[in-house]
């Protein structure tokens, strides 16, 4: 029992997705900031945003899949988890853009 708790604690301490997540979200943030600075319209942003940070997204997605597979998740479950995490990040930064361009 104690060894199981120690193993779980070690897994929780080692966030294998942290670097990839930070790189991906930093890229999204930079894209949003540059889009706001360039005074892009919502339509321009919406057209360009899905292609932004593609390499960083792929690296993050693969890191999430590796993490989940290491925790004995199924491949399908790991892919679904990765898709949800990517979608959450993209929605978050898309909403930041919308808030930044909305007149107060």
Stretches with model-predicted labels:
Residues 1-15:
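Classic N-terminal secretory signal peptides
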Residues 2-5, 25, 42, 81, ...:
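Generic N-terminal initiation segments characterized by hydrophobic and/or small/turn-forming residues
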Residues 4, 40, 66-69:
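Signal peptide-directed secreted proteins
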Residues 17-63:
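Short N-proximal segments of mature Sec-exported proteins
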Residues 46-104:
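Compact alpha-helical subdomains of small soluble proteins
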